[in-house]
Amino acid sequence: MKKTKLLNASLSHHIATLGHTESLVICDAGLPISNQVERIDLALEAGVPGFLQTVDVVISEMFVEHAVVAKEIREKNPQIHDALLDSLRKLSEQQGNCIAVEYVEHEEFKVLSSESKVAVCTGEFSPYANIILYSGVPF
């Protein structure tokens, strides 16, 4: 049995097989997922697991180069936005790189998310709690 934070075998496998610049989406319960993207549905009930909890577990195993979020999160969900930026700042320090955060319109976010290898669906019931994480390399 693994002793790291992430125990979900399928999610761990997807992170391990991401190539440089390939992406993974972590989303709330409402984001539409393209049929072309593999879905890992972690949602058990409203709020479980939460978006931020899921982000923290995923980034404990993933080397992140940059991220994309919807512009709307800043106004419609400032608490999640601020906590998300804090998590990414801490990750930047741990990794020794600068993780650029790009803001796009929500409609563009949905298009970009359809290009990801996998979507991790949470039980989050708050607006615009979605992020696309792009894989980097630790060298």
UniProtKB/Swiss-Prot annotation:
Q: What are the entry keywords? A: Carbohydrate metabolism, Cytoplasm, Isomerase
Q: Is Isomerase there in the keyword field?
A: yes
What metabolic or biological pathway is this protein involved in?
Answer: Carbohydrate metabolism; D-ribose degradation; D-ribose 5-phosphate from beta-D-ribopyranose: step 1/2
Annotated substrate binding lies at 28, 106, 128-130
Report the active site residues. 20
**Chief location:** cytoplasm
The EC number on file is: 5.4.99.62
Compartments where located: Cytoplasm
Its BP terms in the Gene Ontology are: D-ribose catabolic process
Q: Catalysed reaction(s)?
A: beta-D-ribopyranose = beta-D-ribofuranose
EC class, as a word, reads isomerase
Record keyword Cytoplasm present: yes
Q: Look up the record and report any one GO term of the cellular component aspect.
A: cytosol
Which SUPFAM superfamilies does the annotation name? Answer: RbsD-like
Q: InterPro entries attached here?
A: D-ribose_pyranase, RbsD-like_sf, RbsD_FucU
* Pfam families named in the record: RbsD_FucU
Q: Which family does it belong to?
A: Belongs to the RbsD / FucU family. RbsD subfamily.
Q: So what does this one do?
A: Catalyzes the interconversion of beta-pyran and beta-furan forms of D-ribose.
Q: HAMAP family, alphabetically?
A: D_rib_pyranase
Q: How does it assemble?
A: Homodecamer.
The entry's protein name is: D-ribose pyranase
Q: Which organism is it from?
A: Histophilus somni (strain 129Pt) (Haemophilus somnus)
